[in-house]
């Protein structure tokens, strides 16, 4: 059957239900969100004369839940307007409406009796062939299907999203023995392609994959930390970015998730593990967690947990950390370990792991104990929770935001090396690990001919990870590098397309990266058909220009050097726009300043849905001068139509730059006019480079012709400058901005309006680029601009001087 999903019904509007509904709305699906009818009228409803039959009363729970979710931070919707795609109702009046829906997803309270009762009603109302899934995080899927019709059971499956579903990539697909294989295949594909998820096939076992191993790792980390006397700050430092994990580390993660949630899952895993899990006692909640739980110090939801946010005497927010010895909160301290110092020069996280476990201080001991324990446990869970190691790694990476999964981390340390550490701690992994090594296989993964293989335990051979044909992984293509320097690699990714990867810190655009862009264009024009600019960084597509270099030149008053650097940057951006081959960019995460300008000059942008892009130069006392200001003037000019109030259109672009606005999604970039109709948004980050490559191929196949530079950009001249400056003066008078803000804004107004022209007229791109560069240079000579740059470079926020 050729299945498509146009309408989804979500049953249950709690935190997860409402957020899942929002994410389906993000992808353009029509959503029906249902919940129970309230027990009785509240005082506000009585005062308004609302009756028990009125929809405002009957849908109060679902409407309140949805509105609360929409207002949450981070936002669950790509754009607030997408909320119109969600229709609300209640189980009593609207459950029969599910007949018209393609997928019905249950997200009610975690009680088997309630779920089974609801599914009995759903079974009687659904049309045959409708997908039915549950978002349970722990109730056995097969138990929910008991007593249901044959057609229901064939189309029933677990679909476990991680919270928040917009941002966390994991979607576990958990079939029962009766689930039709075509349904499993469809959900795996749909979750990947349309929802942007890493879909992981999981067995119907307690906690599935991610929670089983993730909660084990969290609790054991807390237990080891308590035994070693490590503080909250120390543990979160050790389990944060230095180990390729989110900044939240361990304790902050617990506060975000909610201690009650963690305790609930741990207790369930303990109960369900009786007679089945040799390490069942590991799920006994540690004493410190139990104390916090009993005190109702549950984390963010209760206002305090392992951390607490308070106001200091100056009214400034301060984060305090719990002192385990006193159960009082104290200011976070600076964490320093010799082992961590030894990793500062190692940018590749995978190369840090061996250094971390080799440390001779308490940090090294912590890593050895925690890694050894979780690796042992993971090895023993095969084949119980999964038959394949790669699914375990995918679940942990996508569910918890780790750059490397458990077996990938073990590989990076060295399987034999880690085994020695485990044995020194009297820990013994599964027998299959010893068998693998005895057969001469010394790693869990291999890369051959650009494809990654995993060690398959059942066959005792290496097998290719399925689904790789949908992705291009640069980390697998080291043999395909055709040119490189200290800041960039150029890969031949096949079919006549090159890919330029930045590899500087935060992918900032210094001289090596600029050289790489020019080299990529030159090689592509000579021997290839197109150029993709994309990378696999977890931090940034590009955080912009190399501010440290610019600051150094400005301090030394090397204005000729600055002029040369900016002119070269502008020329490179223009070359990306006006080369003889298509240039396609693939932004994701952060694309700031110069990183944004590069995308503005591409023939096509293939952006990940979670792209946070903006022209942010104003914040450090300058204006965009890599063609960003010019490009926004050009795009506004293209939007002018007869009868338009042109200055209103231009003012929006001006404000986006003056406020250093950064998008909260790729969809918002469309609304900001940073993405255009020709550009594309991709939901699954893993597909980004392959989609960008396909876009470059299509442009080439369709007869790409080298564009001509524009000479028809309409600017407003003195009229526009005067109006903008009047507004700036009013802002200054009202004390909304500082004198220096006003000075920068006036420079921006001058450039974006085309300078000192007597009347509105058409100008060239180069004319605007020259204005940009002139304004940029003058601002680099300002003391307050240098203070802003220095503030950012010192790791803080630029002062609002």
Predicted regions and their residues:
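N-terminal glycine-rich phosphate-binding loop for ADP-containing cofactors
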Residues: 1-538, 548-581, 588-595, 600-602, ...
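Extended, composition-driven regions rather than compact fold-specific motifs
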Residues: 543-545
């Amino acid at each position: 059957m050729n299945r498509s999903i146009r309408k989804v019904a979500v049953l249950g509007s709690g935190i997860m239900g409402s957020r899942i509904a929002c994410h389906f709305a993000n992808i353009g699906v029509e959503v029906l969100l249902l919940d129970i009818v309230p027990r009785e009228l509240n005082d506000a409803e009585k005062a308004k004369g609302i009756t028990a039959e009125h929809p405002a009363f009957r849908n109060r729970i679902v409407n309140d839940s949805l509105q609360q979710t929409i207002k949450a931070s981070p936002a669950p919707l790509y754009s607030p307007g997408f909320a119109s795609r969600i229709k609300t109702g209640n189980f009593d009046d609207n459950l029969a409406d599910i007949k018209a829906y393609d997928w019905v997803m249950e997200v009610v309270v975690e009680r088997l009796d309630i779920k089974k009762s609801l599914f009995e009603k759903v079974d009687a109302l659904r049309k045959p062939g409708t997908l039915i899934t549950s978002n349970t995080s722990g109730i056995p899927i097969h138990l929910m299907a008991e007593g249901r019709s044959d057609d229901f059971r064939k189309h029933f499956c677990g679909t476990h999203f991680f919270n928040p579903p917009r941002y966390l990539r994991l979607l576990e697909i958990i079939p029962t023995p009766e689930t039709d294989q075509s349904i499993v295949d469809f959900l795996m594909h749909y979750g990947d392609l349309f929802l942007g998820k890493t879909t992981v096939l999981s067995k119907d076992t307690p906690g599935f994959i991610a929670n089983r191993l993730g909660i084990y790792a969290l609790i054991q980390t807390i237990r080891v930390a308590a035994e070693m006397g490590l503080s909250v700050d120390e543990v979160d430092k050790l389990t944060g970015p230095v180990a390729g994990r989110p900044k939240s580390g361990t304790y902050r993660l617990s506060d975000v998730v909610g201690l009650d949630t963690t305790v609930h899952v741990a207790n369930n895993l303990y109960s369900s593990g009786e007679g089945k899990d040799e390490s069942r006692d590991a799920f006994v909640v540690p004493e410190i967690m139990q104390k916090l739980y009993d005190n109702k110090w549950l984390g963010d939801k209760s206002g305090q947990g392992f951390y607490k946010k308070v106001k200091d005497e100056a009214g400034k927010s301060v984060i305090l950390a719990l002192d385990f010895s006193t159960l009082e909160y104290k200011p976070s301290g600076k964490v320093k370990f010799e082992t961590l110092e030894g990793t500062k020069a190692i940018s590749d996280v995978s190369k840090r792991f061996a250094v971390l476990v080799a440390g001779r201080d308490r940090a090294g001991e912590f890593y050895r104990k925690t890694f050894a324990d979780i690796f042992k446990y993971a090895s023993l869970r095969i084949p119980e929770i999964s038959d394949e190691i790669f699914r375990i790694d995918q679940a942990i990476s996508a569910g918890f935001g780790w750059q490397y999964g458990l077996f990938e981390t073990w590989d990076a340390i060295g399987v034999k090396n880690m085994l020695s550490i485990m044995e020194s701690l009297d820990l013994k992994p599964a027998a299959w690990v010893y068998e693998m090594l005895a057969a001469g296989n010394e790693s869990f993964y291999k890369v051959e001919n650009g494809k990654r293989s995993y060690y398959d335990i059942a066959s005792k051979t290496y097998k290719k990870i399925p689904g790789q044909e949908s992705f291009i992984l640069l980390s697998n293509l080291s043999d395909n590098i055709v040119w490189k320097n200290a800041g960039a690699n150029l890969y031949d990714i096949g079919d006549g397309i090159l890919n330029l990867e930045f590899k500087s810190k935060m992918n900032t655009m210094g001289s090596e990266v600029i050289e790489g862009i020019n080299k990529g264009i030159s090689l592509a024009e000579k021997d290839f058909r197109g150029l993709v600019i994309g990378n696999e960084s977890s931090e940034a597509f590009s955080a912009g220009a190399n501010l440290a270099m610019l600051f150094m030149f400005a301090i030394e008053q090397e204005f000729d050097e600055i002029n040369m650097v900016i002119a070269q940057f502008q020329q490179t951006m223009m070359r990306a726009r006006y080369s003889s081959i298509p240039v396609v960019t693939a932004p994701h995460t952060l694309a700031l300043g110069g990183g944004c300008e590069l995308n503005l000059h591409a023939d096509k942008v293939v952006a990940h849905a979670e792209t946070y892009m903006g022209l942010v130069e104003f914040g450090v006392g300058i204006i965009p001068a890599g063609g960003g200001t010019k490009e926004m003037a050009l795009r506004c000019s293209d939007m002018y139509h007869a009868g338009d109030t042109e200055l209103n259109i231009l003012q929006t672009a001006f404000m986006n730059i003056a406020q250093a606005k950064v998008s909260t999604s790729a969809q918002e970039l469309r609304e900001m006019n940073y993405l255009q109709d020709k550009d594309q948004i991709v939901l699954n980050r893993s597909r980004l480079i392959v989609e960008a490559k396909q876009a470059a191929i299509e442009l080439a196949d369709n007869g790409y012709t080298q564009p001509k530079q524009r000479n028809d950009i309409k600017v407003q001249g003195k009229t526009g400058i005067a109006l903008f400056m009047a507004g700036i003066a009013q802002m200054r008078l009202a004390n909304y901005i500082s004198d220096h803000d006003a000075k920068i804004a006036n420079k921006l107004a001058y450039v974006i309006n085309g300078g000192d022209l007597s009347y509105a007229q058409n100008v060239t791109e180069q004319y605007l680029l020259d204005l940009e560069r002139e304004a940029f240079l003058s601002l680099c000579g300002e003391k307050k601009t240098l203070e802003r740059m220095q503030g950012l470079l010192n790791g803080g926020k630029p002062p609002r001087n």
